[in-house]
Amino acid sequence: MALTTEQKKEILGQYGLHDTDTGSPEAQVALLTKRISDLTEHLKQHKHDHHSRRGLLLLVGRRRRLLKYVAQVDVARYRSLIERLGLRR
């Protein structure tokens, strides 16, 4: 369920500001989105896994806060990120 190093490098290469960027909000949101989608698939199979469901809700909340920050700082970056990730907002 955890992201492998190769998966992280691939995601950071696409969404980070540079190759080793791990701190920018775009990179963090992209990593959280991948983890959220993986957990969502897990919960489709294991409906009664309430510990993982709580973890999913925490990740969604963290992503929401980061997206709110990006929207406040730069709306163009926010819209670009939402479009590239395929989020509904």
UniProtKB/Swiss-Prot annotation:
One of its GO terms (molecular function) is rRNA binding. One of its GO terms (cellular component) is cytosolic small ribosomal subunit. Keywords: Ribonucleoprotein, Ribosomal protein, RNA-binding, rRNA-binding. SMART domains: Ribosomal_S15. The keyword Magnesium does not apply. Belongs to the universal ribosomal protein uS15 family. This is Small ribosomal subunit protein uS15. It comes from Mycolicibacterium gilvum (strain PYR-GCK) (Mycobacterium gilvum (strain PYR-GCK)). The gene is rpsO.
